[in-house]
Amino acid sequence: MSETIVSEQTVSEFSPASADASQSVKASVGKINLLDLNRQQMRDLFMSMGEKPFRADQVMKWMYHYCCDDFNQMTDINKVFRTKLQEIAEIRAPEVVDEQRSSDGTIKWAILVGGQRVETVYIPEEERATLCVSSQVGCALECKFCSTAQQGFNRNLRVSEIIGQVWRAAKIIGAFKVTGQRPITNVVMMGMGEPLLNLTNVVPAMEIMLDDFGFGLSKRRVTLSTSGVVPALDKLGDMIDVALAISLHAPTDDIRNEIMPINKKYNIEMFLSAVRRYLEKSNANQGRVTVEYVMLDHINDGTEHAHQLAECLKDTPCKINLIPWNPFPGAPYGRSSNSRVDRFSKVLMEYGFTTIVRKTRGDDIDAACGQLAGEVVDRTKRTLKKKMAGEPIAVKAV
C-alpha cells in the first residue's frame, strides 16, 4: 500500500474547534486527540488516511474497553497503521491532580483542564457504580443553592475532557476487559455546569458512552440533568435519546425565580412542556422523567409546597427525588429536617407520585449534590461583583 500523506487540513478537520475550549490543555503540536472523536468521526479520519472504516472500531475498543492510550499495545492493528497514528494522533485524557475518598466509598477526583480544575465523583453501590461527570468549567446559571454556581463560569469542556473523565475513572477503577467487571454502570451528567449549554461537546461524549465500541452503556443508564434551557432541550430530543432528569427545586415560579434565575427566562410551564415533548421522542425514559427537588429549610419544604408541587406535576409523568441540601461556606440556606422531608414525601405519595429521598453520599469530602466547586477562573466576574457589593462569597473548603 502506498504511503498516505496526512495534510495539515486533515488534522484541522478532525480537531474539534471551539472558542470556549481554546484554552484547553495543549495537545502535542498538530496532533488529533482521538478522545475528541465519536465513531463516525474516527471512521472519517481513518478513511481520509486510506484505511478501512473498521479500523475505528478496533481502535475504539482498545481505547474504551481496555483504557489503552498507547498505539503500540494495539496488537491486532498492523504496525504501518500504528506508525501513522503515532504521527498524527494521540489518546490524551485530562489528568487527575487530586483524589479524596469518603468514608462511604465515594471517590472525588479533581481533574486538570487547561490550568483549571473540574470535579468528577465515583459512587459505588452493591449493584451498580455511578460516575457523576462535569460538562463545563464552572456554571453560568447562578442557582443560589449550588456551590458550583458560586464559582462563576469560564468555558465549555471539550468532548475529550468530558469522555476523558469517564476514561480516567475507568482506568483507575479497572478497565472492563482487564477486570471482567464494568467499573462504571451508570453515568450522570450532574457535575459542574449545565449540559444543555454545551450540546456541541456533550452529545458526542454521550454517543461514545452509548457506543458498543465505546463504554457500551444502555441509554437508560446515561442521564442528563438540566435546569431548564428550553430551546436546547427541544434540540436534544432530535440529537440523542438518554435518560432525563430535571432540576426543578420549586413548585411555583415565585420561589423558582428566587433560587434559580433561569426561571425568569424559561418558567416552570415552559420547562415542563419541553420535558413532555422530549418524553414523546424518548424510549430511554420509559415514559417518565426524574424530577430533582432539593429540600431547603422553610424555603420550599412545607406541606403547602408539596401540594403545590403535586398540582404542578399532575400532567408530567415522573418520579420525584427529594434531595437533602448539602451546605457549603457562604450559603444562605439550611437543610430541611428529617421530619419536614418525611411530611413532604408523604403528601406526594398520597397523590400517587413515586417519591424517593436521595441518600447523601460523599458529603464529608464535599462530593455530594450541589457541593462540587473545582477551581474556576471566572470569566463572568461574578465573584468580583459580589465582593464589591459586600455579599458573602462561597469558597471551597480546604
Curated annotation (Swiss-Prot):
Provide GO CC annotations from the record.
cytoplasm
Enzyme Commission number(s) of this protein: 2.1.1.192
Transit peptide found in the keyword field: no
Disulfide bonds listed in the record:
132-369
Instruction: Give the similarity note.
Output: Belongs to the radical SAM superfamily. RlmN family.
Residue ranges of every copy of the Radical SAM core domain listed in the record: 125-364
| Note in the entry | Reaction proceeds by a ping-pong mechanism involving intermediate methylation of a conserved cysteine residue.
Chief place where the protein resides: cytoplasm
Organism ancestry: Bacteria, Pseudomonadati, Pseudomonadota, Gammaproteobacteria, Enterobacterales
UniProt binding sites for S-adenosyl-L-methionine: 193-194, 225, 247-249, 326
Active site, renumbered: 119 (proton acceptor), 369 (s-methylcysteine intermediate)
A GO MF term? tRNA binding
* Cofactors demanded by this protein: [4Fe-4S] cluster
**Catalytic activity entry:** adenosine(2503) in 23S rRNA + 2 reduced [2Fe-2S]-[ferredoxin] + 2 S-adenosyl-L-methionine = 2-methyladenosine(2503) in 23S rRNA + 5'-deoxyadenosine + L-methionine + 2 oxidized [2Fe-2S]-[ferredoxin] + S-adenosyl-L-homocysteine; adenosine(37) in tRNA + 2 reduced [2Fe-2S]-[ferredoxin] + 2 S-adenosyl-L-methionine = 2-methyladenosine(37) in tRNA + 5'-deoxyadenosine + L-methionine + 2 oxidized [2Fe-2S]-[ferredoxin] + S-adenosyl-L-homocysteine
| Role, per record | Specifically methylates position 2 of adenine 2503 in 23S rRNA and position 2 of adenine 37 in tRNAs. m2A2503 modification seems to play a crucial role in the proofreading step occurring at the peptidyl transferase center and thus would serve to optimize ribosomal fidelity.
Gene3D superfamilies attached here?
Answer: 1.10.150.530, Aldolase class I
UniProt-listed GO biological process terms: rRNA base methylation; tRNA methylation
What is the official name of this protein in its record? Dual-specificity RNA methyltransferase RlmN
Binding annotation for [4Fe-4S] cluster: 139, 143, 146
